Amino acid sequence: MSDQEAKPSSEDLGDKKDGGDYIKLKVIGQDSSEIHFKVKMTTHLKKLKESYRQRQGVPMNSLRFLFEGQRISDHQTPKELGMEEEDVIEVYQEQTGGHSTF
């Protein structure tokens, strides 16, 4: 693995005492960095989004999380979205402004 590539890391989200079904999700950023999250099927994805934002050090309102091309809302769960082991969530930084020069 080259120095340029980010090594995947993982984080557990969800209440350990509660048991339940967990899946591992891959969150891939625009820079192709990959972070693995172990998430309970009934955990609101807001928790995953907040954890990702903190790790990346960016404001939450600047990130867009997509699963199978559809934007993920905070209150949705992996179960609601039909997510399975090793599914991928894509993260994009929202770009605003800019202007064209003629």
Swiss-Prot record:
Compartment list: Nucleus membrane; Nucleus speckle; Cytoplasm; Nucleus, PML body
Chain spans, region Disordered: 1-20
GO biological process terms, semicolon-separated: cellular response to cadmium ion; cellular response to heat; protein sumoylation
Pfam families per record: Rad60-SLD
InterPro entries on file: Rad60/SUMO-like_dom (IPR022617), SUMO1_Ubl (IPR046332), Ubiquitin-like_dom (IPR000626), Ubiquitin-like_domsf (IPR029071)
Propeptide position ranges: 99-102
Keyword Transferase in annotation: no
Ubiquitin-like domain segment(s): 21-98
One function term, GO molecular function aspect: transcription factor binding
SMART domains attached to this UniProt entry: UBQ
Keyword annotations from UniProtKB, A to Z: Cell membrane, Cytoplasm, Isopeptide bond, Membrane, Nucleus, Ubl conjugation pathway
Major location category of this protein: nucleus
PTM characteristics: Cleavage of precursor form by a sentrin-specific protease is necessary for function.
Quaternary organization: Interacts with sae2, ube2i, ranbp2, pias1 and pias2. Covalently attached to a number of proteins including rangap1 and ranbp2. Interacts with sox9 and sox10.
Record family assignment: Belongs to the ubiquitin family. SUMO subfamily.
Its biological purpose: Ubiquitin-like protein that can be covalently attached to proteins as a monomer or a lysine-linked polymer. Covalent attachment via an isopeptide bond to its substrates requires prior activation by the E1 complex sae1-sae2 and linkage to the E2 enzyme ube2i. This post-translational modification on lysine residues of proteins plays a crucial role in a number of cellular processes such as nuclear transport, DNA replication and repair, mitosis and signal transduction.
Protein name: Small ubiquitin-related modifier 1-A
Organism: Xenopus laevis (African clawed frog)
Taxon lineage: Eukaryota, Metazoa, Chordata, Craniata, Vertebrata
GN (gene name): sumo1-a
